[in-house]
């Protein structure tokens, strides 16, 4: 198998990289839409290529340095947000509430680990979704195209034809979202002296001792005459991330940095390649091999040791720190069998990566007519992830969660949300998300574990 991988890599290197060289590998793709009009697609791409980048090269460089710190155990990475953004649920209030939730989790993780928390939101670009099947069958037997995210088509069964103009809508929504995030981050909203202002309708740290202890820590810093106007106390950085799936959109927002002359994907600070698109011959790997953003690779039990090494050599040929984040998604029943072998492979080959645990995707179950996840399984996979890294002397760099500040009933916690109450407020268009109450309770349980095992 390794021989075939190496031969394929040699063939790939014969193609000079450009933002559009992924098209040479398009025949291997099973996820991108087939647009009826290539002329309309080209027109949309030309329009987007003339628009301002959503993020800057300098922001991407800073994030890469921070992710390097997470890989070295000097920072902690938290990735969180909706499974998929939507056009109809977009609102200032939703973005503000997700921001509040990120702040609460961030400060709890920093208090727990004693490390700065890198906050990365699945937002301002997380519109496209891979699907297992290109078609779905309605109850009447009619076969229609699968919904693949608002940037591609509509959840409405009458509007499933892919429309390239939806990329323009996604770009403008992302622009508004980033404007709000930057205003919140640098306008005093994230001031740690205003913890009470981070309150949500459901889910807040004030219900436990952690809130009191964090407030006491802030009070102590004030006693040391650390200025309450210091930017460390009043400002924060929120980075954006999404799956690199819809390559015509990514290509149109690719830019060259005028200073370094390097190429960046300017649709987001951080791009990841998913389980379904990380094949060595996929166009997504080809595109990501040429941009200088920090990159994530989702890996499951299906990823072999040789495949992982080949991916790293393709996407990070210079073995740079901070470039690659390995986002593991095994499931609670498989992590013990597969994470150790991959850690050992990385150690033996002296690869530099940051490890991050995605405990969501490997724990998805069908419960009646709904896809759901059991909170206890999600937490248990996180705890096993940390225990395994501790056993191997490696750094567990971060956690990745699908979550929402809304009071949804999509994941089962055996307390407020049961199998019978899933239908009460199940609104996700794709995968089930933790609600604010669930995610904060889970992070508090993680904090208890961390203090017992790592402090």
Predicted regions mapped to residue ranges:
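Non-transmembrane, aqueous-exposed alpha-helical and coiled segments at domain scale
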Residues: 323-327, 332-355, 361-408
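Sec-dependent signal peptide recognition
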Residues: 1-8
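Active-site-facing alpha/beta catalytic cores
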Residues: 74, 84-85, 89-331, 373, ...
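Glycine-rich, charged/polar anion/phosphate-binding loops
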Residues: 62-64, 281-284, 340-342
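N-terminal amphipathic alpha-helix/helix-capping segment at the start of soluble metabolic enzymes
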Residues: 20-31, 58-74
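N-terminal signal-anchor module of multipass membrane proteins
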Residues: 31-46, 51-59, 75, 80-81
């Amino acid at each position: 198998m390794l021989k075939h991988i190496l031969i394929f890599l040699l063939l790939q290197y014969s193609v000079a990289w450009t933002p559009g060289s992924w098209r040479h590998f398009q025949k291997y793709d099973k996820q991108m839409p087939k647009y009826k009009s290539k002329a309309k697609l080209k027109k949309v791409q030309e329009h987007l290529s003339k628009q301002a980048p959503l993020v800057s090269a300098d922001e991407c460089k800073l994030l890469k340095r921070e992710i390097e710190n997470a890989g070295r155990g000097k920072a902690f990475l938290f990735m969180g947000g909706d499974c998929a953004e939507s056009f109809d649920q977009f609102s200032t209030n939703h973005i503000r509430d997700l921001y509040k939730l990120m702040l609460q989790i961030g400060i709890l993780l920093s208090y727990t680990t004693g490390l700065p928390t890198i906050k990365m939101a699945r937002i301002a670009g997380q519109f496209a979704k891979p699907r297992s099947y290109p078609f779905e069958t309605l109850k009447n037997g009619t076969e229609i195209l699968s919904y693949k995210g608002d940037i591609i088509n509509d959840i409405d069964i009458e509007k499933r034809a892919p429309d390239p103009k939806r990329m323009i809508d996604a770009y403008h929504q992302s622009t508004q979202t980033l404007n709000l995030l930057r205003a919140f981050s640098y306008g005093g909203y994230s001031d740690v002296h205003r913890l009470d202002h981070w309150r949500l309708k459901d889910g807040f740290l004030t219900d436990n001792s952690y809130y009191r202890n964090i407030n006491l820590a802030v009070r102590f810093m004030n006693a040391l005459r650390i200025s309450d106007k210091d930017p460390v106390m009043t400002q924060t950085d929120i980075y954006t991330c999404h799956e690199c799936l819809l390559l015509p959109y990514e290509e149109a927002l690719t830019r060259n940095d005028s200073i370094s002359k390097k190429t960046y994907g300017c649709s987001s600070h951080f791009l990841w390649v998913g389980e379904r698109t990380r094949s060595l011959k996929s166009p997504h790997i080809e595109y990501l091999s040429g941009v200088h953003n920090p990159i994530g690779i989702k890996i499951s039990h299906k990823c072999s040791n040789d495949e992982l090494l080949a991916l790293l050599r393709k996407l990070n040929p210079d073995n740079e720190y901070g470039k690659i984040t390995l986002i593991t998604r095994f499931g609670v029943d498989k992590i013990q069998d597969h994470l150790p072998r991959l850690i050992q492979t990385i150690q033996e080959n002296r690869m530099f990566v940051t490890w991050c645990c995605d405990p969501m995707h490997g724990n998805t179950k069908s419960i009646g007519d709904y896809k759901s996840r059991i909170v206890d399984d999600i937490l248990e996979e996180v705890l096993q992830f940390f225990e395994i890294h501790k056993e191997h002397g490696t750094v567990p760099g971060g956690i990745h969660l699908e979550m929402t500040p809304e009071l949804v009933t999509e994941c089962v916690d055996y307390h407020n949300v049961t199998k019978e109450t899933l239908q009460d407020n199940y609104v996700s268009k794709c995968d089930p998300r933790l609600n604010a109450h669930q995610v904060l309770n889970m992070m508090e349980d993680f904090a208890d574990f961390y203090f017992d095992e790592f402090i």
